[in-house]
Amino acid sequence: MNLSSIDFAPTAFQNLLYQAAPYDGIMEFLGRPRSINSIVLLSNGISFAIQVVVFLVIGSFADFGNWRPNILIALSIIAWAIGFGWLGVHTSDKWQVGVGLYIVGLIAYQTTLTFWTAAFPGLARNTIEMKEKADAYVAGTITREQYDYADTMMRSRLANIAFYIQSVGEIFILAIIVGIMFGLDVNASQANNNWGLSVLIAFVSGVWLLVSLPWFFLEKRRPGQDPGRRGVLIAGVWQLWHAMKQIWQLKQSLIYLIGKSIMRRGRERGTIINMCFM
């Protein structure tokens, strides 16, 4: 759930940095003195670099083989642990721990989101509508293009329903969060504000845990694509290479991916805004 890793965690992380920094704003990080902005940017860069390595190693398991549900559960446990771990990190002397929680939290969120989203193709193929389309394709009454179009539309429909429900749920969660903030009197002091942010991260992680359990217990273990003789790891690399060759023929998709990457980096909007004002 992005409220914890993407919204509140960056705020808590940067709060601790500003409170721990001396008057000149220079702190020791990775073996040399750095400004707060430099520390934040380096943390984001480290997180992004690790994500690249992680996805190159295990990313193909999201689409191929039978490991996706197990990997998703393991990654979710890590994400929940990070969220609850913030309860112990709300004072400036623990800013280094905050850096670690922030970096690992971003990685855990992005990987869980990826492996969760990868379930939609399997869900789409197992709907009644797509089973009927598959039978029609085998019988020769529809073309491959018609089947692929129906498959794409079903994936989009399921994803839109899921994200719609998530967005509606977040409205109620945000309302509860406002109540928690007033209950903890976060405006009374710096310490209250720090503690309030840690509580909010843990609360959202608890909601994430609560709504995830039915998925993990009720999800049917549908196999992913067959990697064939290549194996899962090689199939993932081959798919990446094939996509890189084809992307130049889909210039709109390339522009979309570049724009999405830039916007995602910009989601750490607190970082960008702070830099503009400093």
Regions found by a protein language model. Give the residues of each.
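Helix-loop boundary and gating motifs at the non-cytosolic
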Residues: M1-Q51, Q252-M278
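Transmembrane alpha-helix boundary/hinge residues in polytopic small-molecule transporters
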Residues: F8, A12, V57, T111-A119, ...
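Helix-terminus/helix-capping segments at the ends of transmembrane helices and short amphipathic helices
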Residues: Q14, Y18, A62, T117, ...
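Small/hydrophobic positions within alpha-helical transmembrane segments
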Residues: S43-I46, I50, I78, V104, ...
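C-terminal ends and interior cores of transmembrane alpha-helices
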Residues: G45-F48, V52, L72-V99
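Residue-level signature of mid-helix packing/kink "hotspots" within the transmembrane helices
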Residues: G45-L56, I171, L209
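Helix-to-loop junctions at the C-terminal end of transmembrane segments
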Residues: Q51-W67
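Intracellular loop-helix junctions on the cytosolic face of multi-pass helical membrane proteins
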Residues: F84-L87, D93, V97, T111-R269
